[in-house]
Swiss-Prot record:
UniProt keyword terms in alphabetical order: Coiled coil, Exocytosis, Protein transport, Transport
The protein's name: Exocyst complex component 1
Family the UniProt entry places it in: Belongs to the SEC3 family.
Biological process according to GO: exocytosis; Golgi to plasma membrane transport; protein transport; vesicle tethering involved in exocytosis
Organism: Caenorhabditis elegans
The keyword Protein transport belongs to this UniProt entry's keyword annotation: yes
Source taxonomy: Eukaryota, Metazoa, Ecdysozoa, Nematoda, Chromadorea
Gene Ontology molecular function, alphabetical: phosphatidylinositol-4,5-bisphosphate binding
Protein function: Component of the exocyst complex involved in the docking of exocytic vesicles with fusion sites on the plasma membrane.
A Pfam entry, by short name: Sec3_C-term
Length: 848
């Protein structure tokens, strides 16, 4: 590029006294690629006035160049570098109303050209400078890169003073000349006029300054007088400031004395409160109170009330608002020493409560009650209620003693309820077999007319049906009695022992201190209250779960299918709203869990009995009893679960039982002691299972019904293929060997007759062994064999015989096809045709 620059400088610019400052090789101009080389040159004139110009130079033949377009720097409006963050050779120049899109040879050429153009614009065109956008502008250097020629000294002065005027300055200058009725050519006359006006103005200014000398002197005198006044004012301000300082100190002293008086008043008030509180505490407990505690009679309600008042007075003395230093006073110590009688009172109270708990429990056991009812404890509660306030006082002042009393109550009451539950559940369990026996008697006639086709120990037979009326009544009795007893005991325990009193007090204190009781705090308090109540109630009724479990086992032991009815009853009740704070909800939940376990165990037992098939040696299996047992189970379950909510558990049980039945069929078919063919056992039982499921119409078992049908058809095909070759045994063996020989040796079918063992003579010999009479005789034996393998009066006999016919006809056709393929032109045929075979099958079927 430097060589081209020198050539262009010498050919084009040197003769015009111009110097190239920057040059860029233009690859594309306005999106068009130039055939000849095009250059964009930035040049300045050497002599003054200096002018900056842009040239488009076009390359010609023979390495010559020609100036094509010329533009002055004033005409350039905008230079756009496109993207300052990305090196790109493209940039735009707007000259006049036209925008040139230029693609330089490289990004470096573009940057150097725009940088030089910016420097020249700043130096020679600062007012009408073009807009440079999307380009990192360089910092201007103190020296310029233009090196003009040496000029005379006066020319240098002209160069340094030269500043181009702006358009506004030019317009203002023309207005001034026009106002003087002059032209640009008469500028020297205008300059002389301005000089004369300037001289007249200077003279006027001097005369004005001379005339205003007296005024200036007067002004200075006024300023001096003002300064003197300011000094006097400052002295007065200093005097006032001293007075204010004295007042400020006096006020601070007064405030200090006032604060001390406030402290003194507060101290006197607090001292008065302390003394009043101390005196009230001392006066709270009198000698009569102490005497009342010493002579307490807990059997007398009036004495109990007096003891309660005395105990509250002692609590007021102990918990009064007395500061620690006041506790060291002799009056307090003396009164506190006199309260040793409280310890004796507490011991007597604990002894009385222990004896009272035991006596009341014995009294509750001695009362006669209905056999299916749990005795109510209202009398025991009324006897203990007067002591509730003393228990509350004991809980606040003697928590360890209160815990011992609570534990004694739990131990004694636990024994009471254990005995009551023993009697109640023993009577209840004895009612269960009576209910079943009465049901057996009422349905004896009905059960005699029903054939189950199952073992005699099936507890799902109609002779052992559950009592759908008595058993729900027993469950209702259990729940009603337990609910009444548990709720009454819970209310009494909470009220008598004040279980939640400290939590309520703590919650009230927290709410008062915070000014707000949030719902989160309320839920937390309720949770703690329920935990405490459940802990106490759980210890009181720890034997209840054992009795409930025994009751469920007894009901299921007399008839395991009772668990279905229990499950349905409890499933309906579990949807009813329950009080979460009641301990009975926990008991109810435990009963639901126990019944669900019994339900799962019952289904598991049924599955094991369905899948484990016991077969005597050398016996024909026939239809398994598990299928009839499964059908009876489904029928009974559908009656029990009618309109029930928990169908999901029942459908899951159906699925497991049906799978167990299928497992039993597979095990029975594979049993080594069975005389029945494996495929016969499978398709007969799968057929029976399919009929059973079709009759029951259980939607969740629809897929199992389809699978049973598919398995039946699969094993019928296997059975038919197994016994198919018996009427034509030698022919089947012959052609099986032919097919194997062709496949293993790879010879052509029409060449098989050349083998000695497969010659035409051998084929005729084999065919002659199966005349029509022999084939019919073999088919009759096959029919008898099938009839013997199937159960008596089986509906599948004709189905199997029809499949056997179709398979036999296909076999005959296949043999004829092999004869035509392997023995072409031999005219050898089987002695029985397809029509003859069909006639044989029809005659045999009609005979039987």
């Amino acid at each position: 590029m430097s060589a081209i620059r020198k050539i262009i400088q010498r050919q084009l610019f040197q003769k015009d006294d111009e110097r190239i400052q920057a040059i860029v090789n233009v690859s594309k101009l306005d999106g068009k690629k130039k055939k000849n080389q095009t250059l964009l040159c930035l040049a300045v004139t050497i002599e003054h006035p200096i002018a900056v110009r842009l040239y488009f130079v076009k390359g010609e033949k023979d390495d010559t160049f020609k100036k094509k377009d010329r533009f002055n720097l004033r005409e350039v409006r905008e230079i756009d570098g496109i993207n300052p963050k990305k090196a790109s050779p493209e940039f735009h120049i707007t000259i006049g109303d036209h925008q040139y899109v230029i693609l330089a040879g490289s990004a470096e050429e573009k940057d150097e050209f725009i940088r030089e153009l910016y420097k020249l614009s700043c130096q020679y065109l600062p007012v009408q400078m073009p807009d440079f956008c999307n380009f990192s502008l360089p910092q201007l250097e103190s020296e310029t890169s233009i090196i003009p020629i040496e000029l005379p000294e006066h020319d240098m002065a002209m160069q340094s003073d030269y500043q181009p005027i702006s358009n506004k300055e030019d317009a203002d200058f023309r207005k001034l000349i026009a106002r003087a009725n002059l032209t640009i050519g008469e500028a020297h006359i205008f300059a002389e006029m301005l000089t004369e006006q300037l001289q007249s103005l200077d003279g006027a200014n001097i005369n004005s300054m001379m005339d205003s000398e007296n005024s200036v002197n007067q002004l200075l005198s006024s300023i001096d007088a003002a300064l003197t006044g300011v000094e006097s004012v400052e002295k007065e301000l200093d005097r006032c400031d001293d007075i204010l300082a004295f007042v400020r100190n006096s006020i601070e002293l007064i405030e200090e004395k006032d604060s001390l008086s406030v402290v003194e008043r507060k101290n006197k008030q607090r001292l008065n409160e302390e003394i009043v509180s101390f005196v009230n505490s001392l006066q709270a407990v009198t000698d009569s109170h102490i005497e009342t505690l010493k002579q307490a009679n807990f059997s007398n309600p009036e004495s109990v009330q007096r003891c309660t008042d005395a105990a509250r007075a002692v609590a007021q003395f102990w918990h009064g608002r007395i500061s620690k230093p006041m506790l060291q006073m002799k009056a307090y110590q003396d009164r506190n020493d006199e309260l040793t009688a409280v310890d004796v009172f507490v011991d007597r109270l604990m002894s009385h409560l222990s004896a009272l708990f035991s006596n009341l429990n014995d009294l509750s056991l001695d009362h006669e009650w209905h056999e299916l009812c749990i005795p109510k404890q209202s009398q025991r509660f009324r006897a203990l209620s007067p002591l509730s306030d003393l228990i509350n006082w004991l809980k606040t002042n003697r928590p360890k003693a209160c815990n011992l009393v609570l534990q004694k109550y739990i131990d004694s009451t636990n024994l009471l309820y254990k005995r009551l539950f023993d009697n109640f559940f023993e009577t209840l369990i004895n009612k269960v077999p009576k209910a079943n026996s009465s049901e057996k008697k009422s349905k004896a006639n009905e059960s005699a007319n029903i054939s189950l086709r199952s073992d005699n120990q099936s507890f799902l037979s109609t002779s052992s049906e559950i009592d759908t009326e008595v058993l729900p009544q027993l469950i209702e009795t259990v729940l009603a009695e337990l609910s009444a007893v548990i709720d009454a005991e819970q209310k009494f325990v909470v009220r008598f022992f004040h279980i939640n009193s400290e939590l309520l007090a703590q919650f009230d204190t927290t709410s008062t201190g915070s000014g707000d009781s949030s719902s989160l705090g309320g839920r937390s308090m309720e949770k703690h209250m329920n935990e405490q109540v459940r802990h106490v109630m759980g210890n009181l009724f720890d034997s209840l779960n054992i009795h409930l479990d025994s009751f469920c086992r007894a009901v299921c032991r007399h008839n395991p299918s009772n668990v279905l009815l229990l499950f349905v009853i409890m499933s309906k009740k579990v949807l009813l709203p329950q009080d979460p704070s009641s301990y009975f909800s926990i008991t109810f939940g435990s009963l639901v869990v126990l019944i669900k376990r019994q339900f799962d165990a019952f289904i598991q037992m049924e599955c094991s009995q369905y899948s484990e098939v016991r077969i005597a040696k050398k016996t024909r299996i026939g239809i398994l009893p598990s299928i009839f047992r499964f059908a009876n189970f489904v029928r009974r379950a559908e009656i029990i679960f009618e309109n029930a909510e928990r169908r999901t558990d029942l459908e899951k049980a159906y699925f497991n039982l049906c799978r167990a039945v299928c497992d039993g069929i597979q095990k029975a078919a594979a049993n080594q002691y069975s005389k029945s063919p494996s495929s016969v056992v499978k398709f007969e039982n799968y057929h029976e299972l399919y009929l059973t499921l079709s009759e029951l119409k259980i939607s969740c078992l629809d897929q199992q019904r389809k699978d049973a049908k598919a398995l039946k058809e699969e094993h019928i095909d296997a059975y038919v293929k197994e016994f198919m070759g018996r009427p034509l045994k030698e022919i089947q063996t012959f052609f099986d060997n032919v097919n194997n020989f062709i496949e293993t040796r790879g010879i052509r079918p029409d060449e098989i007759s050349y083998q000695q063992q497969f010659s035409r003579i051998e084929l005729k010999k084999v065919i002659s062994q199966h005349p029509g009479k022999e084939v019919k005789k073999g088919l009759e034996q096959l029919y008898k064999k099938i009839e013997k393998n199937l159960v008596a009066n089986s509906s599948l006999l004709q189905v199997v015989w029809r499949d056997m016919q179709e398979q036999f006809v296909k076999q005959i056709a296949e043999y004829n096809k092999l004869i035509l393929t392997c023995y072409p032109g031999s005219k050898i045929e089987l002695e029985v045709s397809t029509d003859t075979v069909l006639q044989f099958f029809s005659e045999i079927a009609q005979q039987h």
